[in-house]
């Protein structure tokens, strides 16, 4: 499978994404960053149930709360803009991973986001190793992708 298929996505700015000035409402960038890595794992072939446990499950599963997030707006993102979304996941430690997301319009960087997740046991809330399938996605995303993070 070509990493570009799960690391480079498209997003169109919709009316509901914008404020009264016609530019993206600030919180949507982080939502898009998170939705993009969710879409990426889906394209890669990982079931959402593996990454995001069901509240109905009684198994020992990991949860992945966000422990840090940032968004930088470099140029206005407007209604109707078609954006290319590039995802750069990386493992920070056995229990932490980061997903950097670049948003480009016509190959010009217009925004960037960063989200850091911590892997915790759902019951004890103690730090635990990242799920194996998530680690494989991170590893595969960093092998010969030729994607350059700006």
From Swiss-Prot:
One of its GO terms (biological process) is phylloquinone biosynthetic process. Its EC number is 3.1.2.28. The active site is at residue 19. It catalyses: 1,4-dihydroxy-2-naphthoyl-CoA + H2O = 1,4-dihydroxy-2-naphthoate + CoA + H(+). Pathway: Cofactor biosynthesis; phylloquinone biosynthesis; Quinol/quinone metabolism; 1,4-dihydroxy-2-naphthoate biosynthesis; 1,4-dihydroxy-2-naphthoate from chorismate: step 7/7. Pfam families: 4HBT_2 (PF13279). One of its GO terms (molecular function) is 1,4-dihydroxy-2-naphthoyl-CoA thioesterase activity. It comes from the Bacteria. It is an enzyme of class 3 (hydrolase). HAMAP family: DHNA_CoA_hydrolase. Catalyzes the hydrolysis of 1,4-dihydroxy-2-naphthoyl-CoA (DHNA-CoA) to 1,4-dihydroxy-2-naphthoate (DHNA), a reaction involved in phylloquinone (vitamin K1) biosynthesis. Belongs to the 4-hydroxybenzoyl-CoA thioesterase family. DHNA-CoA hydrolase subfamily. This is 1,4-dihydroxy-2-naphthoyl-CoA hydrolase. It comes from Prochlorococcus marinus (strain MIT 9515).
């Amino acid at each position: 499978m070509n990493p570009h298929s799960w690391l480079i996505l498209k997003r169109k700015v919709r009316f509901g994404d914008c404020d009264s000035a016609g530019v993206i409402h600030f919180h949507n960038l982080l939502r898009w960053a998170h939705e993009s890595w969710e879409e990426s794992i889906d394209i890669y072939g990982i079931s959402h149930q593996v990454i995001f446990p069901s509240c109905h499950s009684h198994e020992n599963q990991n949860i992945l709360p966000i422990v840090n997030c940032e968004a930088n707006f470099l140029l206005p993102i407007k209604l109707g803009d078609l954006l290319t979304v590039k995802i750069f996941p990386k493992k920070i430690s056995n229990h932490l991973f980061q997903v950097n997301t670049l948003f480009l319009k016509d190959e010009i960087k217009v925004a960037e986001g960063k989200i850091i997740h911590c892997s915790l046991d759902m019951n004890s809330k103690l730090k635990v190793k990242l799920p194996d399938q998530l680690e494989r996605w991170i590893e595969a995303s960093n092998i010969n992708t030729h994607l350059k993070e700006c």
